[in-house]
Amino acid sequence: MIRNNKSKDKIVIPEKLRSDVIDTIPKVLELCPIPESIDITYIKDQVKVYMEGRQQFYIETGRNPYIEDEFSEYWIAKASKGKQIGKGSCGMDVKTHKNEGIDVMCVVMNKGISNEKSLMQNFSSAGKNLDTLFTEKKDIEALTLFTEEYISKIKKTQLNNNLSDLYILSFISTKKNIYMICLKLYIDRINNVKSSGFTEKLKNIKTEYFIDSKIGDIRLYKSKKRLELRLKNNIIYDTNIVNLYTIE
């Protein structure tokens, strides 16, 4: 028997594409249970009342239901026996009775991805240099400008309001449901965030390791001078999600 000693070429997967490597890198935002300080039953009751006068409108127009920011922040403050602290440029909206900081967001899920939530916007210091860095294709420097500003903003909020753990609490609307999901914010992990390059038309910069790419996407936008979070549809299948309301 003649043996073929020619070995098959081994396919090497680049390290940055290997899921086992990516998954071990701690993210700045990670899914977690709704904090125990928040009374979920209270939130459900408030959403039910809110929707009573609106449900028929959403059914007839085919639009997704939407929770207005002013209501959601007020509800979370009441449900946590806390208070609203987010007026102005504060990095959090609510301080719970357990001294947790909650940044509340309300988004609509459309075609697999939500509309945006602004994490950081700057038209002055960092914003002035952003156009130049985009023109020079310096994505790392541009992203660093905004992540450093974000760290400063959050840590200042945490210190001034004596906050412990920090969270982003999201109301997510689909055609039929309103959900609530929580992301824990680990601000000290922001150094893990990397640029994954510009989009084709150089309008924004994609990021890695800010959030698991299966559940969300965070980009820096040139025109808006803003770091934005969008959630992906996969997030509504997470075990920590709470269904607040269903349109019958």
Where are these regions (language model features)?
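Redox-cofactor binding/interface segments in oxidoreductases and associated redox assembly factors
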Residues: D103
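Nucleic-acid endonuclease domains
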Residues: I2-C90, T96-H97, C106-E248
